[in-house]
């Protein structure tokens, strides 16, 4: 079933109190916003605050060009600039939670994007270079999770906002 149809159908079953409202929202790019917040990668969060297109920013890093160059060419209808932005989206979705080349290939296929071997190799590398605090956060999460399993009942922090504890 079409997701929009499914949502429209499910909303028919919600009731609201008189004089109360009901809102529906899309948590746009939620996975790309939560991770930098958890990891303290504030420069990335600031791009959202500034209204920047994170996918174009990623693409500029992948293809060693500028945000302005890709944005200008996209506005002019350049299909290669559209491909570059799509690669930036793939990078965000595939690499944010430690995905590598296999994840890039999977997400690229889902986006209908054909990438060269060099692009597939380069996408995770440029992401990791651009987000050192996120990379450190991955290691902190792994370390805290292992320690929690090894030390039943004790709590271990990963960054400022995540705590691991084994209770079983």
Predicted segments, located by residue:
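Conserved catalytic core of nucleotide polymerization and phosphodiester-bond processing enzymes
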Residues: 1-168
């Amino acid at each position: 079933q079409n997701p929009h149809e499914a949502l429209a159908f499910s909303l028919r079953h919600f009731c609201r109190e008189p004089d109360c409202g009901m809102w529906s929202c899309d948590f746009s790019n939620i996975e790309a916003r939560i991770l930098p917040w958890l990891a303290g990668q504030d420069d990335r969060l600031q791009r959202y605050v500034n209204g920047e297109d994170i996918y174009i920013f990623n693409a500029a890093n992948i293809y060693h060009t500028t945000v302005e160059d890709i944005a200008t060419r996209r506005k002019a209808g350049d299909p290669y600039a559209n491909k570059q932005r799509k690669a930036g989206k793939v990078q965000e979705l595939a690499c944010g939670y430690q995905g590598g080349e296999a994840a890039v290939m999977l997400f690229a296929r889902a986006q209908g994007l054909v990438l060269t071997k060099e692009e597939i190799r380069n996408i995770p590398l440029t992401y990791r270079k651009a987000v050192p605090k996120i990379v450190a956060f991955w290691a902190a999460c792994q370390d805290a999770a292992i320690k929690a399993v090894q030390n039943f009942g004790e709590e271990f922090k990963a960054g400022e906002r995540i705590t691991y504890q084994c209770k079983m």
